[in-house]
Amino acid sequence: MTQANLSETLFKPRFKHPETSTLVRRFNPGTQPAVQSTLDGKTVPHWYRMINRLMWIWRGIDAREILEVQARIVMSEADRTDSELYDTVVGYRGGNWIYEWATQAMVWQQKATQEPDQTLSGQHWLHAANLYSIAAYPHLKGDDLAEQAQALANRAYEEAAQRLPCNMREIEFPIPGGASVTGFLHMPPGEGPFPTVLMCGGLDSLQIDYYSLFERYFAPKGIAMLTLDMPSIGFSSKWKLTQDSSLLHQHALKALENIPWVDHTRVAAFGFRFGANVAVRLAYLESSRLKAVACLGPVVHALLSDPQRQASVPEMYLDVLASRLGMHDASDEALRVELNRYSLKTQGLLGRRCPTPMMSGFWKNDPFSPEEESRLITSSSLDGKLLEIPFSPVYQNFDKGLKEITRWITQRLC
């Protein structure tokens, strides 16, 4: 089936699709707090979703393109589930968030199929994959249209992989007691086996969102990167997130000794946001398999255990947490109780001495991850390093922080 036909088949109207903001039923919706963070973007009045412009630009989307798509959504006069929120247009049509971003992705998909130069075609496919991923954002369970956009994002990424200079392999990992999961191994030029970083992403992202991390930071150092979707999204959608948050990544980590392109004696884990929960858990449970663990803006305790902090983050992020836990219609109190069980301190891990070297980067006044969170991680390690990243200028400091983390990982792997 051609890519164009796949798009038509997937998005063919069958019934009234649920609108994203209605999928998680909040019992006590409060006022939307004003939030701005490097990794998550910011709350913008009249938008349900956090607008994560920095990360979208970092992934290769042009700022003007973002504004153009947003403008189309704002200008729509179609019915909305909440007349105050632009991105709540009902149904797959003009003005709907998923429709507009997927339509933009199809423009790049078309360019990719018509481009004779393989590398350029690969870049266009990658661009399309990123746009399809934004269409599916924030990847809530039960969002039929978003899940279809995810399928197109993964398909476009596979097409990009065949054309881009980096060597990429799709690897299936069997998981006892359930469906296998698929990861992407990104390899730098040269002969393997390579030292490898296991990437653990945030709960509101797909594994394909981190290609820039490999291309700009790890590949130049001769380091491979293995990605895996977090439980309940993408290729891991058949798995619910549980208190054993590192289950899928742990099985992938154990399987690395059987993968010829990976030097399984030189492996590190890197966690963004809740992905740090997975990475730090692995630092304790699999210290013999990991040379190092790095975190950025980690979510390992404070947000999971402090009701005040939970009240200070945007509605969309709480919806993401509830969705990952399979608690779409739970009371706020029930959600709070359940979230506390995911704290690595509550689980009795963090605070105990850990032999794995751990580094954690943080921003001052980060609503999702206070400085104490990173201090808790680094002080628990026998070889801990704390990295403060100044907020402004945002893009340059984000890049500088990633370079510092890459340097630290490289020293421990190479």
UniProtKB/Swiss-Prot annotation:
Transmembrane segments annotated in the record for this chain = none
SUPFAM superfamilies reported in the protein's UniProt record: alpha/beta-Hydrolases
Xref: Gene3D superfamilies: alpha/beta hydrolase
**Which E.C. number(s) belong to this protein?**
3.1.1.1
The UniProt entry, under InterPro entries, shows: AB_hydrolase_fold (IPR029058), FrsA (IPR043423), FrsA-like (IPR010520), FrsA_esterase (IPR050261)
Instruction: Please indicate if the UniProt record lists Glycoprotein as a keyword.
Output: no
A Pfam family it matches: FrsA-like
Q: Which domain of life is it from?
A: Bacteria
Drop me one GO molecular function for this one: carboxylesterase activity
Disulfide bonding pattern of the chain? none
Catalytic reactions of this protein: a carboxylic ester + H2O = an alcohol + a carboxylate + H(+)
Keywords per UniProt: Hydrolase, Serine esterase
Q: So what does this one do?
A: Catalyzes the hydrolysis of esters.
The record's comment on protein family reads:
Belongs to the FrsA family.
Q: Mind telling me what this protein is named?
A: Esterase FrsA
Task: Say which species the protein is native to.
Answer: Enterobacter sp. (strain 638)
